Amino acid sequence: MDQHYRGDIRVGRGFTAVRCVGNFIRKRRKQKTVTDIYVDGGTRGSRICLVDKSENKTIIKTRGGDLTNNELEYLAVLYALDYINNRHKKDNITIYSDSKLIVNQINGEWRITTDRLQPLYDKCMKRMTSKIKIKWIGRDSNLAGIILED
């Protein structure tokens, strides 16, 4: 069989550059991108923070009102879910939080016993998809938490 190479594209009998490029594009579409998002909420300054490692992006929002730390943690996750649904629809997402309460409630391992958290939990669950996972990490590893502490 007569074949030769031009750059990365093999050209020869029954094997054209167009077919090769088409196969490459189809394979790339099937590959899933993994995105890591770090979130945190803190009562000092009533702020939430989101760090998107894939885009090297940090977002800090100030929230008004008399909110507890757990409410701010939920608001950070809600903001992350809205951010994800607008930017990373095709990606596999992992949200990292240092709040065991929030992570375990969203993962269905712990019950919600505070009436103020129930509506926030419900909003989170409406926005969650099968491509989004939420995991707990220690405070020292949470990039968003480190930023909020400064």
Where are these regions (language model features)?
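RNase H catalytic domain
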Residues: 42-44, 78-150
